[in-house]
């Protein structure tokens, strides 16, 4: 604080901010208060925003240099609004007692204070660069002032429109609050007396529209004294006149009383004609209410005229109105669709609830979650029920609804050809029988004379069509036979009359019974001399197949594929059985069926042999088969003819799929590519999840961990298998898996349908695997790549040879068997200690013979104490290779000398024998 009161002057003319400036201080310097009466002149560069002053107002004249403190009393009209304002002499004293950062400007003619330190000299001459900088700053300030003027004009227009809306709302509220107005009218005389001295007209708060103002007029209407607060309120640290303060306290008390039963603070009060108003004409500060100054920034508490915006007041008014009306909203119950998993945020949006409310409910239930957390459908259903909504559960599998297993009406069903599967043991003549029926020669084109693919054909008998499915009879093709039995209506069990019932015959019977299809027994090869059909019938009885000739219900026909005997009777039996079954299907619907076989053709791409079971398949339609989809490019029959459509029970080859489906997959026609892609992606994701679950289960299960620990020492034979069709690859993988033992097993690194490519060679090189091609070949680039890298490629067309070669190769990985052969025993008679040799045992051969270099065991009291090899074997002084029984010899062990008389030396030979699987 300073000790002198003469070095300051207070300027209250107009609405200028009170500042303190030393004498002689030029523009751009600021007096900084250092505390305890110390000051410091600081040269600064400031950017001032000059408010736009209306043209009709005159600029505020500076205070006369020699004027005393009382000279500041004459003020503009807004300041003279309160005649009871006392002399400002106490304000000077108060200003000396309360230090602030803003001091009144100091007149230049006054002498410097004695207590001030020497001020730094500020040069009045500026350099050209500084002048340019000031000019630029002045130009920027003028541009900003122009923008502020435009912005203020727009704000005034907006607030004028808001004022009209506000007054309309106030008029509505006035009708509901007539009782409170009567109370305020009764109190009006008491309030009007202290306000009568002020020159402000009472009509200032009438409903007449006011001119737009930069600052909100709502606070002015709420507190009349606040409108002129920046002008009437003394500077920080000055004394407030008692009369003004008392009147303001009374007014604030009045407002608080009205807030209890009327509008809350911050809201605009309705026009009240009977209530005296103490407002003053708007001053320059009110017009610049929207501009932030030091004075307005320091204003806080209830005197702040810019407490809230019109939007905030409207919100509070609306909130208060809702509270007065006490309207209860009716709860809207919605149907919430819940997938298998959903986030809390998504659930709240579907319920049209706040996520915070859902989080609060979960916290009450003891679960701390965030809006982004994922919950299952059960918990989501509980939450939705708690909030009063209904739930409809859906899952990802719903994308397949309406595609498979669609029921047909009885009126739409028509007769269809029967689907017949030929099953039986290998080499019992299944394919030959089908060739005889089709008048074709498929057997001659098969490698090894055995069927290794599943084939579908259609023949016509007496104007009726019959669809045949030929399955392999080899033991490796169990899955193919099972698929054939599932897709068929009638199963023909082919049994050779000279070979009778065999293992695959029994398996075929079980597949047919599991599929629930009727069986027709075809006893083949009856033209042979050793044929015995009755033996076949008797053996079938052991497996619960009772033929008609034995009192059963199963049809049996003796046929010969070679001579064509009784083939017509077999076809008649098939048609008779089909008539009994009354096979029907709906041809006027989207197609649905089963994939019989699939392969990757080099020229045609992915080719799938399908059996249409329902509907009609046409080119151009979009189908989904397993996890692949595509648009049908062409339909090819078993004879190679292109057809325009394929009805129920018709086997065709489909071209145009995006990939090679698995044999046995269901296919169906969908309406759009997007639907097909969605189903395909869902099935692929499901397959990945299952694979991941299997891997995680293997890692987590204790039993699996023990098995993995045991399998650490198992040797693996890595293979890359490429085949012509998916069924063959499946059969090869199953056959190789059965070859595995506890010591060695085949590991299939990769398998697929199609030719051998360079990527297969690269994979085999990385995994050190051999490549097996079944009925496929490697292209030129792949073959050259394999030769450079030394990768072995083996080609096979018969599954027997493939399995035998892999079995032999895996046998080479087995450790050889160690076999011991007993040679003889010798008893130690005496032990001699010979220099440079060590201990030598004098022995007599009591059984067999003793050979040098053979393995020996030293047995003492029937306990083996040492096992090793003979270091020397002598008879007398000569080294010998062997000593027969009954003779004496001298023996010494390698790295062992603890020999005693009476010990027995057992001599044996070790042989390593190669093992096979």
UniProtKB/Swiss-Prot annotation:
<dbReference type="InterPro" id="IPR009000">
    <property type="entry name" value="Transl_B-barrel_sf"/>
</dbReference>
<dbReference type="GO" id="GO:0005829">
    <property type="term" value="C:cytosol"/>
</dbReference>
<feature type="compositionally biased region" description="Basic and acidic residues">
    <location>
        <begin position="127"/>
        <end position="184"/>
    </location>
</feature>
<dbReference type="InterPro" id="IPR023115">
    <property type="entry name" value="TIF_IF2_dom3"/>
</dbReference>
<keyword id="KW-0648">Protein biosynthesis</keyword>
<dbReference type="InterPro" id="IPR013575">
    <property type="entry name" value="IF2_assoc_dom_bac"/>
</dbReference>
<feature type="compositionally biased region" description="Low complexity">
    <location>
        <begin position="215"/>
        <end position="244"/>
    </location>
</feature>
<dbReference type="InterPro" id="IPR005225">
    <property type="entry name" value="Small_GTP-bd"/>
</dbReference>
<keyword id="KW-0963">Cytoplasm</keyword>
<dbReference type="InterPro" id="IPR053905">
    <property type="entry name" value="EF-G-like_DII"/>
</dbReference>
<feature type="region of interest" description="G3">
    <location>
        <begin position="470"/>
        <end position="473"/>
    </location>
</feature>
<comment type="similarity">
    <text>Belongs to the TRAFAC class translation factor GTPase superfamily. Classic translation factor GTPase family. IF-2 subfamily.</text>
</comment>
<dbReference type="InterPro" id="IPR015760">
    <property type="entry name" value="TIF_IF2"/>
</dbReference>
<dbReference type="InterPro" id="IPR027417">
    <property type="entry name" value="P-loop_NTPase"/>
</dbReference>
<dbReference type="GO" id="GO:0003743">
    <property type="term" value="F:translation initiation factor activity"/>
</dbReference>
<dbReference type="GO" id="GO:0005525">
    <property type="term" value="F:GTP binding"/>
</dbReference>
<feature type="domain" description="tr-type G">
    <location>
        <begin position="415"/>
        <end position="582"/>
    </location>
</feature>
<feature type="region of interest" description="G2">
    <location>
        <begin position="449"/>
        <end position="453"/>
    </location>
</feature>
<dbReference type="InterPro" id="IPR006847">
    <property type="entry name" value="IF2_N"/>
</dbReference>
<feature type="region of interest" description="Disordered">
    <location>
        <begin position="1"/>
        <end position="304"/>
    </location>
</feature>
<dbReference type="Pfam" id="PF00009">
    <property type="entry name" value="GTP_EFTU"/>
</dbReference>
<keyword id="KW-0396">Initiation factor</keyword>
<dbReference type="GO" id="GO:0003924">
    <property type="term" value="F:GTPase activity"/>
</dbReference>
<dbReference type="GO" id="GO:0097216">
    <property type="term" value="F:guanosine tetraphosphate binding"/>
</dbReference>
<keyword id="KW-0342">GTP-binding</keyword>
<feature type="region of interest" description="G4">
    <location>
        <begin position="524"/>
        <end position="527"/>
    </location>
</feature>
<feature type="region of interest" description="G5">
    <location>
        <begin position="560"/>
        <end position="562"/>
    </location>
</feature>
<dbReference type="InterPro" id="IPR004161">
    <property type="entry name" value="EFTu-like_2"/>
</dbReference>
<feature type="compositionally biased region" description="Low complexity">
    <location>
        <begin position="185"/>
        <end position="203"/>
    </location>
</feature>
<comment type="function">
    <text>One of the essential components for the initiation of protein synthesis. Protects formylmethionyl-tRNA from spontaneous hydrolysis and promotes its binding to the 30S ribosomal subunits. Also involved in the hydrolysis of GTP during the formation of the 70S ribosomal complex.</text>
</comment>
<dbReference type="InterPro" id="IPR000178">
    <property type="entry name" value="TF_IF2_bacterial-like"/>
</dbReference>
<dbReference type="InterPro" id="IPR000795">
    <property type="entry name" value="T_Tr_GTP-bd_dom"/>
</dbReference>
<dbReference type="Pfam" id="PF03144">
    <property type="entry name" value="GTP_EFTU_D2"/>
</dbReference>
<protein>
    <recommendedName>
        <fullName>Translation initiation factor IF-2</fullName>
    </recommendedName>
</protein>
<feature type="compositionally biased region" description="Basic and acidic residues">
    <location>
        <begin position="246"/>
        <end position="258"/>
    </location>
</feature>
<dbReference type="Pfam" id="PF04760">
    <property type="entry name" value="IF2_N"/>
</dbReference>
<feature type="binding site">
    <location>
        <begin position="470"/>
        <end position="474"/>
    </location>
    <ligand>
        <name>GTP</name>
    </ligand>
</feature>
<keyword id="KW-0547">Nucleotide-binding</keyword>
<feature type="region of interest" description="G1">
    <location>
        <begin position="424"/>
        <end position="431"/>
    </location>
</feature>
<feature type="compositionally biased region" description="Low complexity">
    <location>
        <begin position="63"/>
        <end position="113"/>
    </location>
</feature>
<dbReference type="Pfam" id="PF08364">
    <property type="entry name" value="IF2_assoc"/>
</dbReference>
<dbReference type="Pfam" id="PF11987">
    <property type="entry name" value="IF-2"/>
</dbReference>
């Amino acid at each position: 604080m300073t000790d002198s009161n003469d070095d300051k002057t207070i300027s209250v003319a107009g609405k200028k901010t009170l500042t303190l400036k030393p004498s002689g201080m030029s523009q751009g310097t600021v007096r900084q208060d250092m505390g305890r009466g110390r000051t410091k002149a600081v040269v600064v560069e400031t950017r001032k925003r000059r408010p736009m002053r209306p043209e009709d107002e005159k600029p505020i004249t500076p205070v006369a240099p020699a004027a005393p403190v009382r000279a500041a009393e004459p003020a503009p009209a807004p300041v003279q609004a309160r005649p009871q304002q006392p002399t400002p002499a106490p304000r000077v004293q108060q200003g000396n007692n309360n230090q602030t950062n803003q001091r009144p400007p100091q007149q230049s003619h006054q002498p410097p204070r004695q207590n001030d330190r020497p001020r730094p000299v500020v040069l009045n001459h500026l350099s050209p660069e500084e002048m340019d900088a000031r000019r630029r700053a002045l130009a920027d300030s003028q541009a900003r002032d122009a923008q502020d003027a435009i912005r203020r004009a727009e704000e005034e227009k907006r607030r004028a429109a808001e004022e009209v809306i506000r007054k309309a709302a106030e008029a509505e509220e006035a009708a509901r609050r007539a009782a409170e107005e009567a109370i305020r009218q009764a109190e009006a005389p008491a309030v009007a007396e202290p306000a009568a001295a002020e020159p402000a007209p009472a009509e200032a708060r009438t409903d007449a529209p006011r001119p737009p103002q930069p600052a909100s007029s709502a606070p002015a209407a709420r507190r009349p004294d606040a409108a002129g607060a920046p002008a009437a309120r003394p500077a920080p640290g000055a004394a407030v006149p008692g009369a003004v303060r008392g009147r303001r306290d009374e007014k604030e008390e009045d407002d608080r009383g009205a807030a209890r039963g009327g509008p809350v603070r911050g809201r605009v009060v309705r026009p009240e004609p009977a209530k005296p108003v103490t407002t003053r004409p708007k001053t320059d500060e009110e017009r610049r209410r929207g501009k932030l100054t030091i004075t307005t920034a320091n204003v806080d508490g209830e005197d702040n005229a810019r407490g809230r915006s019109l939007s905030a007041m409207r919100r509070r008014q609306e909130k208060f109105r809702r509270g007065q009306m006490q309207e209860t909203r009716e709860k809207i119950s919605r149907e919430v669709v819940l997938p298998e998993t959903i986030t809390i945020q998504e659930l709240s949006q579907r319920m049209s609830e706040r996520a915070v409310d859902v989080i609060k409910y979960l916290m009450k239930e003891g679960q701390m979650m965030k809006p982004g957390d994922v919950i299952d459908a059960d918990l989501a259903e509980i939450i939705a029920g708690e909030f009063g909504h209904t739930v409809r559960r859906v899952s990802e599998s719903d994308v397949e609804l309406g595609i498979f297993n669609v029921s047909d009406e009885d009126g739409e069903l028509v007769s269809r050809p029967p689907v017949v599967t030929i099953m039986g043991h290998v080499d019992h003549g299944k394919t030959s029988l089908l060739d005889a029926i089709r008048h074709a020669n498929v057997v001659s084109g098969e490698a090894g004379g055995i069927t290794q693919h599943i084939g579908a054909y259609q023949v016509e008998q007496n104007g009726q069509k019959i669809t045949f499915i030929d399955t392999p009879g080899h033991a490796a093709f169990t899955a193919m036979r099972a698929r054939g039995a599932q897709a068929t209506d009638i199963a023909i069990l082919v049994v050779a009359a000279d070979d009778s019932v065999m293992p695959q015959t029994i398996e075929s019977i079980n597949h047919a019974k599991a599929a629930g299809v009727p069986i027709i027994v075809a006893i083949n090869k009856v033209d042979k001399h050793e044929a015995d059909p009755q033996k076949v019938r008797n053996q079938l009885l052991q497996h619960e197949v009772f033929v008609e000739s034995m009192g059963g219900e199963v049809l049996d026909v003796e046929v010969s594929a070679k001579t064509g005997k009784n083939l017509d009777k077999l076809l008649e039996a098939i048609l008779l059985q089909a008539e009994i079954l009354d096979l029907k299907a709906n041809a006027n619907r989207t197609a649905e069926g089963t994939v019989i076989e699939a392969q990757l053709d080099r020229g045609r791409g992915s080719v799938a042999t399908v059996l249409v079971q329902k509907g009609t398949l046409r080119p151009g339609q979009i189908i989904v088969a397993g996890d692949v989809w595509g648009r049908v490019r062409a339909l090819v029959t078993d004879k190679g003819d292109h057809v325009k459509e394929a009805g129920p029970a018709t086997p065709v080859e489909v071209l145009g799929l995006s990939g090679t489906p698995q044999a046995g997959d269901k296919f169906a026609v969908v309406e759009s590519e997007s639907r097909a892609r969605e189903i395909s992606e869902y099935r692929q994701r499901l397959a990945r999840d299952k694979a991941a679950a299997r891997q995680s289960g293997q890692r987590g299960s204790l039993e699996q961990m023990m098995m993995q620990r045991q399998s650490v020492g198992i040797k693996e034979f890595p293979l890359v298998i490429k085949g012509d069709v998916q069924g063959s690859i499946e059969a090869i993988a199953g056959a190789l898996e059965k070859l595995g033992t506890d010591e060695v097993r085949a590991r299939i690194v990769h398998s697929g349908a199609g030719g051998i490519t360079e990527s297969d060679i690269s994979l085999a090189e990385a995994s050190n695997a051999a490549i097996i091609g079944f009925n496929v070949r490697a292209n030129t680039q792949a073959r050259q790549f394999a030769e450079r890298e030394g990768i072995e490629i083996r080609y096979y067309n018969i599954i027997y040879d493939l399995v035998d070669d892999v079995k032999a190769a895996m046998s080479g990985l087995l450790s050889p068997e160690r076999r011991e052969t007993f040679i003889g025993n010798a008893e130690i008679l005496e032990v001699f200690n010979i220099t440079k040799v060590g201990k030598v045992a004098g022995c007599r051969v009591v059984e067999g013979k003793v050979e040098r270099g053979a393995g020996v065991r030293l047995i003492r009291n029937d306990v083996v104490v040492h096992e090793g090899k003979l270091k020397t074997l002598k008879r007398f002084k000569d080294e010998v290779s062997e000593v027969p029984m009954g003779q004496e010899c001298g023996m010494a062990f390698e790295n062992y000398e603890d020999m005693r008389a009476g010990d027995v030396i057992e001599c044996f030979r070790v042989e390593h024998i190669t093992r096979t699987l």
